[in-house]
C-alpha cells in the first residue's frame, strides 16, 4: 500500500502575456485563476510569467532548485492559440507524463461545458520527483482541476517517494 503524502507544498505559476505585462508596468493584475489556486493550495510560491517556452522551462528549473515544493501548478497557455506554449514547453522537460490526468480532467470538463472541453490541453507529468500540472487559464477549469489535484496529488507523491 502506497503512503499518501500529506502537507503537500505547492508552487503556482500563471502563464499570461497580458498579466505579465500588467505586472511589469506596475498595474493591478487581474489573475483570478492564479489567486484561486494559490489560496486553495496554500501555495508557498506564486509568480506570473509570459507565454514563452524558455521562461516556462526556466521557472520550473528555478522552483525545483531554490524552493522546497512537491508540486508546481501552471495555469494558462494550454489553449490552441499560437502563443499557448505551456504544454509544449513542459513536454520538453518532463520525465513521465500522467495521461490519466488529462483524461479525467476532460471528462469532468465535458460534464460542465460540453464539447468545448476538447479545446483543453491540460496535462500532468513528473519532473525530478515533483508533480507538474498544466491547467487552462479559466477560473472554472481551475476549480475543476482542483478536485483532482487535491484528491490525488498525495497519492502520486506516495508512489514517487516509494521509489
UniProtKB/Swiss-Prot annotation:
Q: What EC number is given for this enzyme? A: 2.7.7.75
Give the domain of life. Answer: Archaea
Identify the pathway: Cofactor biosynthesis; molybdopterin biosynthesis
Q: Which Gene3D superfamilies match?
A: MoaB/Mog-like domain
Could you list this entry's UniProt keywords, alphabetically sorted: ATP-binding, Molybdenum cofactor biosynthesis, Nucleotide-binding, Transferase
GO CC terms: cytosol
Q: Which GO terms describe its biological process?
A: Mo-molybdopterin cofactor biosynthetic process
Query: SMART domains annotated for this entry?
Result: MoCF_biosynth
Query: Molecular function terms in GO for this entry?
Result: ATP binding; molybdopterin adenylyltransferase activity
Reactions performed catalytically: molybdopterin + ATP + H(+) = adenylyl-molybdopterin + diphosphate
- Give the UniProt family note: Belongs to the MoaB/Mog family.
Q: Which PANTHER family match?
A: MOLYBDENUM COFACTOR BIOSYNTHESIS PROTEIN B
Described by its record, this protein's role is as follows: Catalyzes the adenylation of molybdopterin as part of the biosynthesis of the molybdenum-cofactor.
Q: By its UniProt entry, which NCBIfam families does this protein fall under?
A: molyb_syn
Q: What is this protein called?
A: Probable molybdopterin adenylyltransferase
Organism of provenance: Methanocaldococcus jannaschii (strain ATCC 43067 / DSM 2661 / JAL-1 / JCM 10045 / NBRC 100440)
